Amino acid sequence: MERTFVALKPDTVERKLVGRVIQRFEDRGFEIVEMRMLTLTMEMAEEYYGEHKGKEFYERLIKFMTSGRIVAMVIKGERAISTVRKMLGNTCPCDAEPGTIRGDFGLYTPANIIHASDSLESAEREIDLFFGR
């Protein structure tokens, strides 16, 4: 079984969509093995999104991700990383297919509901950052 990291962004919490998004993962047979709600500090957000430092959207992303509570999760299941990424849809909600999480709930970037690890290495790094392993 593979594990991946998923973060429900501040817009998901604010719009009371947490349960609906989690239900999608459970309906696909995934298991939520760890979960916590927190507000990112500036330092944690900068470490989390360090790969984007210097890009035009970086400051806006950091400001958004520290604007409210997020839900950090570890999800386990068969091919979790690739399947969860497909379930999310395109990063930009306007380009995401209906039936995907971003297509159904996303508003705009960065308020696109959710983040999920894109590789095994990213999943391990993000799980360690949020759950201390």
From Swiss-Prot:
<feature type="binding site">
    <location>
        <position position="91"/>
    </location>
    <ligand>
        <name>ATP</name>
    </ligand>
</feature>
<keyword id="KW-0460">Magnesium</keyword>
<dbReference type="GO" id="GO:0005737">
    <property type="term" value="C:cytoplasm"/>
</dbReference>
<keyword id="KW-0418">Kinase</keyword>
<keyword id="KW-0808">Transferase</keyword>
<comment type="function">
    <text>Major role in the synthesis of nucleoside triphosphates other than ATP. The ATP gamma phosphate is transferred to the NDP beta phosphate via a ping-pong mechanism, using a phosphorylated active-site intermediate.</text>
</comment>
<dbReference type="GO" id="GO:0006228">
    <property type="term" value="P:UTP biosynthetic process"/>
</dbReference>
<feature type="active site" description="Pros-phosphohistidine intermediate">
    <location>
        <position position="115"/>
    </location>
</feature>
<feature type="binding site">
    <location>
        <position position="9"/>
    </location>
    <ligand>
        <name>ATP</name>
    </ligand>
</feature>
<dbReference type="GO" id="GO:0006183">
    <property type="term" value="P:GTP biosynthetic process"/>
</dbReference>
<dbReference type="InterPro" id="IPR001564">
    <property type="entry name" value="Nucleoside_diP_kinase"/>
</dbReference>
<keyword id="KW-0546">Nucleotide metabolism</keyword>
<dbReference type="GO" id="GO:0006241">
    <property type="term" value="P:CTP biosynthetic process"/>
</dbReference>
<dbReference type="GO" id="GO:0004550">
    <property type="term" value="F:nucleoside diphosphate kinase activity"/>
</dbReference>
<keyword id="KW-0479">Metal-binding</keyword>
<protein>
    <recommendedName>
        <fullName>Nucleoside diphosphate kinase</fullName>
        <ecNumber>2.7.4.6</ecNumber>
    </recommendedName>
</protein>
<keyword id="KW-0963">Cytoplasm</keyword>
<dbReference type="InterPro" id="IPR023005">
    <property type="entry name" value="Nucleoside_diP_kinase_AS"/>
</dbReference>
<feature type="binding site">
    <location>
        <position position="112"/>
    </location>
    <ligand>
        <name>ATP</name>
    </ligand>
</feature>
<feature type="binding site">
    <location>
        <position position="57"/>
    </location>
    <ligand>
        <name>ATP</name>
    </ligand>
</feature>
<comment type="similarity">
    <text>Belongs to the NDK family.</text>
</comment>
<keyword id="KW-0067">ATP-binding</keyword>
<keyword id="KW-0597">Phosphoprotein</keyword>
<dbReference type="GO" id="GO:0046872">
    <property type="term" value="F:metal ion binding"/>
</dbReference>
<keyword id="KW-0547">Nucleotide-binding</keyword>
<dbReference type="GO" id="GO:0005524">
    <property type="term" value="F:ATP binding"/>
</dbReference>
<dbReference type="InterPro" id="IPR034907">
    <property type="entry name" value="NDK-like_dom"/>
</dbReference>
<dbReference type="InterPro" id="IPR036850">
    <property type="entry name" value="NDK-like_dom_sf"/>
</dbReference>
<feature type="binding site">
    <location>
        <position position="85"/>
    </location>
    <ligand>
        <name>ATP</name>
    </ligand>
</feature>
<dbReference type="Pfam" id="PF00334">
    <property type="entry name" value="NDK"/>
</dbReference>
<feature type="binding site">
    <location>
        <position position="102"/>
    </location>
    <ligand>
        <name>ATP</name>
    </ligand>
</feature>
